[in-house]
Amino acid sequence: RDVERSRGLGDVYKRQVLSDYDFQKIIACDKGLEICQECDILPDLVIGDFDSAKTDIVASYREKTEFLDLDTHKDFTDTHVAISYILEQEIRPDEVILVGATGTRMDHTLANIGLLKQFAEFGISAYLIDEHNRITMTAHQHIVKRTDAYRYVSLLPYTEQVTGVTLQGFYYNAQGLTLKLGESIGVSNELIAECGLIEFESGLLIVIESRD
C-alpha cells in the first residue's frame, strides 16, 4: 500500500500506530515534527508556519529534510495545506493516515474530520487515528474489520442525509435506512461478524470506530 502520514499522536499509543503501517511517505505538520523527533523518524516533508513546534527542533530538521514554510497569517490550517499538497501530486496514495489531528482544540478536531471529505471525494481511504478512535469518511461502500482495538462502530452523516443505508454483520443491521444530520440513530453499533459491510446510495458518511 502507498500510505502517507500527517503529524503524530501522543503518549505510548502513537508508537503502536506508527508501527502498524508501512509508510511510503511521511509528512510532518508543524508540532508533529516533535513527535518525529521522539520516535526517531525523518519525515520526507515538513509543512507549517511553525508557531507551535519548538524552534530548536525545527532548526535541527532544516538540515536534514525538505521544508514548505507557510505564512502565519494564512487562510488554511497546516493540515489543510498538507492535504492539498497530497492531492495535487501526480501519483496519489491509496491510503492516508492522519495522527495527532485531534486534541483539546475542538475547532481543530472538527475541522480535521471535515478535511477527510477531500479524500472521500477522490476515493482515497483516509483515517484519522488517536488513542481512542479511528475515523474515516466515505462516499461509497465501506468495510469495517473486526478488531480487539475498537468495540463500537458509529455512523454519522456529514451531508444533510445519507440515504439507502444497508448494514450487514452488525448487531444492529439495516436495509434502506436514511441517516439524517442532527439525529443519533447511527451511534454505538457493534460488529458481530468478522467484517461489517456498509453500503448506501447517496451522501457522505463518517465512520467512527471507538475503543471505549
Question: Could you describe each region identified by the protein language model?
Answer:
Residues 2-13:
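Single conserved hydrophobic/aromatic residue that forms the stacking wall/gate
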Residues 19-21, 31-121:
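Acidic/Gly/His-enriched mid-domain segments of enzyme catalytic cores or analogous surface patches
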Residues 88-91, 118-124, 160, 177, ...:
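Generic secondary-structure signature for well-ordered alpha-helical cores
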Residues 107, 117-147:
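Class I SAM-dependent methyltransferase SAM-binding "motif I" and its flanking Rossmann-like core
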Residues 138-212:
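Long, charged alpha-helical interface segments
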